[in-house]
């Protein structure tokens, strides 16, 4: 397309439907109008983050595919609630609001996940017991590996174009 043509590439996610997308935007110019126009458009339907073009595949895996991973975690939490006796309706409502609250603690408070986790864990408590069980079952490793595999697949699909 040449250097005179300014292009902004955007990768939103499906939360765009409720104006809560995380849209990553890359541009072929350092300070171009295409980028500003894209940011203006996508800021209306969520948050935007300017990234380097070479980070777009990783952003696809985390920002676009990642929404499914967080939804799967919410579904699993809801199923756990049902397993311990909650109704399906109440369990899903609790899982959804708890996930939303956790995300807000980080986005509004600007804290790191571990500092928020530390606030709810107590020695010999039920939270640390549950966290340790999840880690022994591979929770973090599975999430990390899923994102890595998605980025690898995105790279293969991109090369086919």
What role is predicted for each listed range?
Residues 9-24:
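Active-site capping/gating segments
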Residues 17-21, 58-60, 129:
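A short acidic, helix-capping loop that chelates divalent metal ions and anchors anionic groups
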Residues 2-6, 22-59, 69-109, 153-157:
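Internal alpha-helical scaffold of NAD(P)-dependent oxidoreductase catalytic cores
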Residues 26, 65, 130:
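Thr-Gly-centered strand-to-loop micro-motif
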Residues 8, 56-61, 113-118:
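Short pre-catalytic strand/loop immediately N-terminal to key active-site residues, enriched for Gly-Thr
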Residues 65-69, 93-94, 119-122:
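A generic short alpha-helical patch detector that favors 3-5-residue windows
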Residues 96-161:
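NAD(P)-dependent Rossmann-like dehydrogenase/reductase catalytic/cofactor-binding core
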């Amino acid at each position: 397309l040449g250097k005179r043509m300014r292009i902004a590439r955007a990768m939103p996610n499906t939360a765009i439907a409720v104006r809560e997308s995380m849209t990553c935007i890359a541009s072929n110019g350092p300070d171009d109008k295409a980028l500003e126009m894209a940011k203006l458009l996508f800021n209306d339907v969520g948050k935007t983050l300017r990234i380097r073009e070479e980070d777009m595949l990783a952003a696809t895996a985390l920002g676009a595919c990642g929404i499914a991973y967080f939804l799967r975690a919410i579904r699993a939490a809801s199923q756990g609630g049902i397993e311990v006796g909650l109704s399906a309706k109440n369990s899903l409502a609790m899982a959804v609001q708890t996930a939303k609250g956790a995300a807000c603690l980080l986005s509004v408070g600007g804290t790191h996940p571990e500092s928020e986790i530390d606030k709810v864990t107590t020695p010999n408590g039920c939270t640390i017991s549950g966290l340790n069980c999840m880690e022994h079952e591979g929770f973090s490793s599975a999430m990390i590996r899923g994102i890595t595999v998605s980025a690898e697949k995105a790279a293969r699909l991109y090369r086919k174009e």
